[in-house]
Amino acid sequence: MTPLAALAKAPPARPSERLGTGLAGVTSERVRAIKAQPRSEYEAHAFYHDAAFRLDAVKLMPGEYFVHDGDDLLLTTVLGSCVSVCLIDRAAHLGGMNHFMLPDGGSAGRYGVYAMELLINGLMKRGARRERLQAKVFGGGHVMSNFSTINVGEQNVAFIDQFLASERIPVVSRDVLDIHPRKVCLFPGSGRALVKKLAAAQASGIASQEAAVRGALSKAPAQSAAGSVELF
């Protein structure tokens, strides 16, 4: 079944889920319950209602991660040269996503090593088993045309390939490199991931945002579902 067909068969939203547009409209009971739980510094918190999927959702910004059990909450992010890793424990119906900007550089969620530690630890605290984890990898696009000698996306992809191999976490699907920015959606309970390559017109805006964040970082003190990829 295509994603569009799946959307057509999706059940209508219950009255409590017919939320307003934008982040401020989220008032469902499940989101209130999630917000009431203790949160880590780098855990995503931009909740909204996704009208296309008729689900509550949380959008990950650079440096953030999120873990959830079940498919009642959609995890989403938009990537340029950044990389997002989705880790899934199907037996536990548990999954999570992160979004990192650079391979290494300190103890912050925007750096790959720490981003992976946050995600793996978050999953294991919720009952995941390390030996059951599977990975889906997205992003690393060459969207920053002014970077002729250093391709940040390639560096990010090379890092995560090496990291997952060293940790013996199998990669069951991936959509990386190329020149396109991407939107990624994860249904954490089933592990189903959707990826949409965005138009070239959107690449410059995403690249500018990433460049601005990287510029700020350079001035800051260093701190210590099966394997197929579905398009939508």
Which ranges hold each PLM region?
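Short acidic-hydrophobic catalytic motif
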Residues: 1-82, 91-94, 100-104, 109-134, ...
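Active-site-proximal betaalpha loop/short-helix elements
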Residues: 85
